[in-house]
Amino acid sequence: RYSTTGSSRKRNAQPIRSKGPNGEIALAHNGNVVNAAPLREELEGWGCRFDTSSDSEIIAHMLTNVPGADWGERVATMMRRLSGAYSLTVLTKDAVMGIRDPLGVRPLCIGKLDAGWVIASETCALDHIGATFFREVAPGEAVIIDSKGLRTIYKREQNGCASCIFENIYFARPDSAIDDKLIY
């Protein structure tokens, strides 16, 4: 996937990898972080080295460097600090996480396969691999899929939803469903 910000160069392509005190992750991001510049400066002050000009790398470094006893606490800290729109898929050494911004600007869904779970930004991706739609990741929710199964690890309450008006018109494929509504 091409970067959400920064130039469309190979080094900005996703997934973005980051390694820090919390382990190593690979992250895919749909959206834009509007407070990226001050967060980047702060992370550089912590000793984080940036290889891209992408806001996705800022999110990845936050997750691998913010304090917290577990992924739920780290995601909570990250979500309190980020401003903007984001749907994230994060791969750790033993789990996959799906994280959606508090306003639900970008879609994110969970699918079920016979052998496990899938996280995707659109339901049409589920169709291509034979997965069935399970549910949307709610605005402000972070889910994790690990050896314990699928569960919510953080839920930030927010009044209302602010889905992007261009999602259904320009971005989404016509064979997708977003927020439980068919696009076509």
Give residue spans per PLM region.
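Conserved short alpha-helical segments that host acidic/polar catalytic motifs at enzyme active sites
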Residues: 1-139, 144-184
